[in-house]
């Protein structure tokens, strides 16, 4: 349940209600207009707001590595690579398919770890 809510907040998808059953689940979601929702990450401070948003979902070590990669891209003068790296994250926001893929992957990892299993 926490994972469903967390994924919804991260992806910008509002989870209205859900039903978790024995071997599957159902979600009722509202997906905002992507163009409008992403405007919060534009303009002055937009990149920092995006990185703060990502840090709610990704580990500290992942975020440190991402910040380092962005710094390296810019240090060598490759602003296009830095923007492409950030756009890869933006593409997954307000996308139900991306949310469901990530949700199922993370649930599988949690379940397998909890029950001492491997695979997907």
Feature names for model-found ranges:
Residues 1-120:
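Short catalytic/metal-binding and nucleic-acid-binding patches
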């Amino acid at each position: 349940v926490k994972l469903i809510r967390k994924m919804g907040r991260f992806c910008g998808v509002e989870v209205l209600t859900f039903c978790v059953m024995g071997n599957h689940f159902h979600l009722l979601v509202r997906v905002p207009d992507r163009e409008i929702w992403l405007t919060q990450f534009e303009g002055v401070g937009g990149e920092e707001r995006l990185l703060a948003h990502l840090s709610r979902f990704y580990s500290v070590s992942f975020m440190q590595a991402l910040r380092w990669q962005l710094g390296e891209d810019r240090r060598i003068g490759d602003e296009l690579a830095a923007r492409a790296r950030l756009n890869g994250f933006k593409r997954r926001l307000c996308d139900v398919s991306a949310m469901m893929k990530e949700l199922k992957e993370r649930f599988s990892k949690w379940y397998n770890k909890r029950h001492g299993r491997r695979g997907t």
